[in-house]
Amino acid sequence: MKVEEKAGVKKLEPTSYRRRHPEQDFPSIHIGFPVPGYSQRKSDSKGHLSGLQRVQWSLQPDKSQQDLAGPDGIKASSLGGSVDFTKRIRSPAAEQLQDILGEEDEAPNPTLFTEMDTLQHDGDQMEWKESARWIKFEEKVEEGGERWSKPHVSTLSLHSLFELRTCLQTGTVLLDLDSGSLPQIIDDVIEKQIEGGLLRPELRERVSYVLLRKHRHQTKKPIHRSLADIGKSVSTTNRSSARSPSAGPTLHHSTEDLRIRQSTSYGHLCHAQSRSMNDISHTPNTDQRKNKFMKKIPKDSEASNVLVGEVDFLDQPFIAFVRLAQSSMLGGVTEVPVPTRFLFILLGPSGRAKSYNEIGRAIATLMVDDLFSDVAYKARNREDLIAGVDEFLDEVIVLPPGEWDPNIRIEPPKKVPSADKRKSVFSLAELGQMNGSVGRSGASAGGGGSGGGAGGSGAGGGGSGNEAEMPAMHEIGEELIWTGRFFGGLRLDVKRKLPWFPSDFYDGFHIQSISAVLFIYLGCITNAITFGGLLGDATDNYQGVMESFLGTAMAGSLFCLFSGQPLIILSSTGPILIFEKLLFDFSKANGLDYMEFRLWIGLHSAIQCLILVATDASFIIKYITRFTEEGFSTLISFIFIYDAIKKMIGAFKYYPINTDFKPDSITTYKCECVAPDTVNTTTVNDSALLVPNTNMSVYTPLNLTALDWSLLSKKECLSYGGRLLGSSCQFVPDLALMSFILFFGTYSMTLTLKKFKFSRYFPTKVRTLVADFSIVFSILLFCGIDACFGLQTPKLHVPNVIKPTRPDRGWFVAPFGKNPWWVYPASILPALLVTILIFMDQQITAVIVNRKENKLRKAAGYHLDLFWVGILMALCSFMGLPWYVAATVISIAHIDSLKMETETSAPGEQPQFLGVREQRVTGVMVFILTGISVFLAPILKYIPMPVLYGVFLYMGVASLNGIQFWDRCKLFLMPAKHQPDHAFLRHVPLRRIHLFTLVQILCLALLWILKSTMAAIIFPVMILGLIIVRRLLDLIFSQHDLAWIDNILPEKEKKESDRKKRRKEVHENTDKEPQFLPPSVVKIPMEGIPSDPQNGIHCVGRKRSSSWSHSL
């Protein structure tokens, strides 16, 4: 088949240098790529180019050296040499792609499910058999069994892509065809082929007969059908063997066999009128509707069908690419009941089955490519499709055949590069292709990714220009803009949050919310009990466990109902506990009333918080970069981990392991209760006393002298003044070891069940359910283990009566009457420290929660959050309850428990993180349950405390995930060759990274020392000190380094942005036409690739160079 040039395909002969072999003269592939001129500054190359600059694929015959100079006088030296030129190379394909892909107003195109069917012959019968399918990655039908292969990355030969390009150039292309059935589509395609002289009219019925054969799909069959098929296949094989002892498999693929059998089959076409030409049903069959694979296909998807095969009656390929105007159900053509939008048909002469199959795989792979699928949907003509293929060729990676086995299936990557990056690349300065850039940018590939694949460049790939290597600027949301108006920020927060208020409730009705509520509830009550007990010891029970429970329930529920960020969980913190202890000691030493003094400090602090809200003081949070965020969150995580381990070690001290126990001396071990020397003979009425083996009522008055002290229990003996005597009296079962099993078992089981989501066992929904309820399952499991053993491990004790811990105080604190008048104004000074502490804790936690990595779509409310924290502080001060502020670790755990991922993902594709389920229901339910925990005390008393310590440990460890500081700390222990491919490691020297990490470690150590001493009262001031330290780092590190390992401070960002803007204006005024080097040329001999003119699919040779000369 002769390859003809089509309209709109222009011949472009770039000026290039080519080195000729002294003894050979043969056609060559010239792979050219434009290089930015060296006279132009690199920093000026970004964003000033129009058109899509592409890698140029050009097949041209050898020319004399004089012809290479070009009509414009452009001269080229050897590859990589400096070249002067004055004209920019622009390709028609670049303009086409820029026009059709530049429209961003349209809705995204549906996901394409692509199925490839190959023509199979069984005797006189023919059918289309499904051989492969794609959603994102390729799945093949295994030849040795009725099963699908694992999803894998499609590996295509470069030659098949060239042949596909030729197919689109020479075949029939029908765009927006208005047909609703397969016979009608085939009739239109055949008619178009006959009109174009590509098919002889007498072959119409033969081609139509082949294309309308039934399709057999690789679907899962019931077990009874599978056994029946096995028996049928065995009997068929026996009959075939009886007819011909040398007979091969049932399906014949050899050319000779096909020719003989097809001639017999087509001989029956004369009787076509007596039987149907169409074997395909118009509606989906039962197998299609029941196919479970439909769950993997996104909603509103469309299908792309690829049909390839070989026949003996064609002397040139029958090629057609069809795009329907509206997707239509084509009956049994597709494996699943998905409407078809695209068809690619390739029927060719016999003997090239493998070549046709590779071309089919190539077009199928392109159809599921994000960018080419957009081109296919928006293409206006044939040239647009060819331009899409050329863009795909720009991104193709070629592996040397001697270094890679194509039979090895490449596992799908964990992170796939976004197609948006490719779509936005319309200039060479931003080109992040594998083949499109050289020089310095090629050495620093993958600007934004954490790996080669993620960055789009990997090893050996071209990166961006100098400016493109910089990461995204530190984005400051509009919530932190200083308005300059009285309560301006608060009013804007309210306006932003009001539209989302109804959805904050109905978005919470999801099964995932149940797991989040139980997880955070257990963390909150554990924290409330621990903090309440410590606070009771520090304040002589003026504030205890009951006050902690009531304050947590009231403050937390009100905050989650009305705050700007309801995902934040309020709790008490260590610095507040230290402040309360110092305040109580000061009041006691100076004869002041502690509760009244504390009330005035809380009122002043609340007023100061409201002043900060009124003046939009929260805008200074934009100066908190990753350096401060990660230092603060890492410190809180370490506190959780340290406290959990410390409490576990305390169990070993309280219940020591019996190292002196000797099993051989068990007969000498005894313990008995001995009566005291003098016993009061008066009677005792004690309901707790129960003498074993007697019928004595528990309420019967007892005479202690009449008791048999040897029958009393340990508790009874000690309560009535008796003494324990014996060598085994100090024996304690190994409660410490059992507590450790419960503690570490809960932590490790939770961690394992969380990772179970990414295992290979059980269906996706089961794994997701187990991962979401991992905390609940772990707690229930180890509570059951503790109950089975029946050991007296420490249990959770919750007050069962709502009353103040101290009997001489009530639920309201009077503001006057117990302290001198000067105490009221003097409390402003300690209130200032509390305000700094509250402000920093609250806003740093809010910044961490509102990170862009969490993909929160509802607006934040920094001013509204601080407003409610101030109001709640005043309310808690009047009621004598603890003060509450945002809890970093529990808030991060709340975020993690509400993360959403794609419900349907393509086989082999990792679930994509969609964001967080933003709502108020979980927070409100957590604190309501905390409040009614008093009535749940009979149930909660069965929960061992070591289990809750394990939950604490998990919270601390889990909150360290995703912190870059922790990743950089681990680099100290890794050799360079084993270090992960983090993005910052590509752009910042390792010694600079270690220096930055050491500074953070020193700051963290200083904060830890302050927290552990009485100087913890100045802890909030030291948080402010972190911001100062970060500003001083600008004197040590460059802005480039800080951009990768931290964030650039706002004023630095503004200066950088202004500098770029001025430079852009100067560039636009002085240099409207950026210059490029002429394409450098690599000569690839084509002598070993034979052309076969008979089938019409081949690489274009000496006289067909224009078919390939698109400068892309």
Swiss-Prot record:
Biased amino acid composition, Gly residues:
444-465
* Region named Disordered: 1-80, 220-255, 439-469, 1055-1112
A GO molecular function held by the record: sodium:bicarbonate symporter activity
The regions listed as transmembrane in this protein's record are: 514-536, 548-579, 599-620, 735-753, 773-792, 821-839, 859-875, 881-900, 921-940, 946-966, 993-1010, 1016-1033
| Residue intervals annotated with topology Extracellular | 537-547, 621-734, 793-820, 876-880, 941-945, 1011-1015
Give UniProt keywords alphabetically: Anion exchange, Cell membrane, Ion transport, Membrane, Sodium, Sodium transport, Transmembrane, Transmembrane helix, Transport
Q: Where in the cell is it found?
A: Basolateral cell membrane; Apical cell membrane
Q: Which parts of the sequence lie on the Cytoplasmic side of the lipid bilayer?
A: 1-513, 580-598, 754-772, 840-858, 901-920, 967-992, 1034-1112
InterPro entries under this entry?
Answer: Band3_cytoplasmic_dom, HCO3_transpt-like_TM_dom, HCO3_transpt_euk, Na/HCO3_transpt, PTrfase/Anion_transptr
By its UniProt entry, which Gene3D superfamilies does this protein fall under?
Helical hairpin bin (1.10.287.570), Mannitol-specific EII, Chain A (3.40.930.10)
The UniProt function text for this chain reads: Mediates sodium- and bicarbonate-dependent electrogenic sodium bicarbonate cotransport, with a Na(+):HCO3(-) stoichiometry varying from 1:2 to 1:3.
What's the name of the protein? Electrogenic sodium bicarbonate cotransporter 4
